[in-house]
C-alpha cells in the first residue's frame, strides 16, 4: 500500500536518504543529510511510503494517483517497516518557466527490488503530477546507478542536462 507521509516522519525519511546514499557510496559519512531534510522537507514536498496491507499474505491491487485519498494498493511483501520511499519537491523549468515536480528520492529496500515497486511509485507520482497540472517531472541520478538509469529510461525519461563537477584541491 502507498501511504502519504507526514512531516512528523522526518527521522524515518532521513534514515531512507542515508540508506540510499550508503548503497551507492558505502564508505562515506552522510550525517549532513539531516540538514537537507531539515531545509527541504515540508508539507509542500510530499512524501509517500510503501508498506504492507492487512495480515501477512494479504495483498492489494495495483493503483495509481492520489485522487483525494491517502492510500493506493499494489502487491507487496509483508513488512514491519516501510520497504520503499518517494519524496518529491518542486522545481522551475529554467527554459520554459513552468513549475514541475522534482523527485528528491526514490528508494526501495534492496531485498524488495525488481518486483515493480519502483515502477509503481514512478507511475503514481506521474499521475499525481498530472493531476496538479505539471507538464514534466525532473530528477537527478548518479551515472553509476545503472539499475535506476535503466528504470528511468524504460519509463521514458530523457537526459535534458548534465551536472558537471570539478573537484578542487586546496593545495597548489
List PLM regions with ranges.
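Acetyl-CoA-dependent GNAT
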Residues: 1-55, 68-105, 109, 122, ...
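Active-site acidic-Proline motif in GNAT/NAT acetyltransferases
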Residues: 109-111, 115, 143-144
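Conserved acetyl-CoA pyrophosphate-binding loop and the N-cap/start of the following alpha-helix
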Residues: 112, 116-124
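Conserved active-site alpha-helix within GNAT-family acetyltransferase domains
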Residues: 119, 143-161, 166-168
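Conserved GNAT acetyl-CoA-binding A-motif
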Residues: 122, 130-140
Amino acid at each position: 500500500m502507498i501511504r502519504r507521509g507526514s512531516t512528523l516522519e522526518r527521522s524515518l525519511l532521513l534514515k531512507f536518504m542515508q540508506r540510499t546514499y550508503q548503497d551507492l557510496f558505502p564508505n562515506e559519512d552522510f550525517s549532513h543529510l539531516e540538514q537537507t531534510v531539515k531545509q527541504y522537507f515540508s508539507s509542500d514536498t510530499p512524501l509517500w511510503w510503501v508498506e504492507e496491507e492487512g495480515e501477512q499474505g494479504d495483498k492489494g491491487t495495483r493503483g495509481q494517483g492520489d485522487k483525494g485519498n491517502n492510500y493506493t494498493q499494489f502487491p507487496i511483501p509483508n513488512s514491519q517497516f516501510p520497504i520503499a520511499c518517494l519524496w518529491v519537491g518542486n522545481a522551475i523549468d529554467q527554459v520554459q518557466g513552468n513549475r514541475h515536480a522534482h523527485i528528491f528520492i526514490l528508494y526501495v529496500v534492496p531485498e524488495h527490488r525488481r518486483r515493480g515497486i519502483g515502477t509503481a511509485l514512478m507511475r503514481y507520482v506521474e499521475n499525481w503530477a498530472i493531476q496538479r497540472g505539471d507538464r514534466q517531472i525532473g530528477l537527478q541520478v548518479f551515472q553509476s546507478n545503472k539499475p535506476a538509469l535503466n528504470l528511468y529510461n524504460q519509463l521514458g525519461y530523457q537526459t535534458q542536462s548534465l551536472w558537471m563537477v570539478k573537484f578542487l584541491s586546496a593545495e597548489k
